[in-house]
Amino acid sequence: MALPLIKPKESEESHLALLSKIHVSKNWKLPPRLPHRAAQRRKRVHRLHEDYETEENDEELQKKKRQNRDAQRAYRERKNNKLQVLEETIESLSKVVKNYETKLNRLQNELQAKESENHALKQKLETLTLKQASVPAQDPILQNLIENFKPMKAIPIKYNTAIKRHQHSTELPSSVKCGFCNDNTTCVCKELETDHRKSDDGVATEQKDMSMPHAECNNKDNPNGLCSNCTNIDKSCIDIRSIIH
C-alpha cells in the first residue's frame, strides 16, 4: 500500500503573491451595495409615522378651525343681540326724554300763568288794602246784628212794690251816722242817699203812670189795672199820651 505524498502547507504570503500575478482578461463592474432590509423597514416605519402625525396634525388643525369658526359665529351673534338691546334701550330712553321735555314745557307755561295770576292778585290786594284803610273799620258781628235786626213787641212794665219795700228797708235813719262824718262837716253819704231816694220816687211815679189803664180798658176791676189787651201792642189799652207827657 502506497502512502500519499504529503506536501507542506503553503503560506498566505505565497498565496497572495500568486493572486497578484493573476491577470483578468475582462473588466468587471461590481453592482452597488443594496441597503439592508432592516434599514428599509425602519425608513418605511418612519415614513408611516410621519404620515400618521401629519394626519393627526391635520385633524387637530381642522378641529381648531371649526372651534374658531364657532367662536366667531357666537361672538357675532352676541354682538348683534347686544346691539339690538342697546338700540331698543336708546329708543325707549328717547321716548322718556321727549315725554319729560313735553311735561317740562307744560309746567313752565303753568308756572308763568300762576306767577302772572299771583302778581295780579297782589296788586288787587294792595288796592283793597288801601281802600279799607281809608274806610273806618266796623265789627262784623255788629254789622250782622244791624242787618238782621227785627223789632220786638212792647211789653208793659209792672211796678214791683217788693223792690220799693226793700229799698225803703235798706234806708238808714237820719240818726245813724256812716262813721266817716261828724257834726261840723257835710255828710256826703246822706246827700247820696237823698238823691237816690228822689230818683227811685221818680221811677215809681213813671211806672205807676204807665200802668194806669186807658178809659177804654175792658177790665178796670182788675187789681193790677190791666186787661188782656194791655199786653198786646196792637190792642193796648195803655194811654201812650200819658207816658209821653
Curated annotation (Swiss-Prot):
GO terms for biological process: cellular response to iron ion; negative regulation of transcription by RNA polymerase II; positive regulation of transcription by RNA polymerase II. Homodimer. Residues 63-82 are annotated as: Basic motif. SMART domains: BRLZ. One of 8 closely related fungi-specific YAP proteins (YAP1 to YAP8), which all seem to be transcription activators of the environmental stress response and metabolism control pathways and to have similar but not identical DNA binding specificities. Present with 238 molecules/cell in log phase SD medium. The keyword Electron transport does not apply. It comes from the Eukaryota. PANTHER family: AP-1-LIKE TRANSCRIPTION FACTOR YAP1-RELATED (PTHR40621:SF6), TRANSCRIPTION FACTOR KAPC-RELATED (PTHR40621). Keywords: Activator, Cytoplasm, DNA-binding, Nucleus, Transcription, Transcription regulation. One of its GO terms (cellular component) is nucleus. Its main location: cytoplasm. The gene is YAP5. Residues 58-121 form the bZIP domain. Transcription activator involved in the regulation of genes expressed in response to environmental changes and metabolic requirements. According to genome-wide promoter binding and gene expression studies it is a coregulator for the expression of ribosomal genes, while its own expression is induced by the cell cycle specific activator SBF (SWI4-SWI6). This is AP-1-like transcription factor YAP5. It is found in: Cytoplasm; Nucleus. Residues 68-77 have a biased composition (Basic and acidic residues). One of its GO terms (molecular function) is DNA-binding transcription factor activity, RNA polymerase II-specific. Residues 86-114 are annotated as: Leucine-zipper. Belongs to the bZIP family. YAP subfamily. Residues 34-47 have a biased composition (Basic residues). Residues 34-77 are annotated as: Disordered. The keyword Transport does not apply.
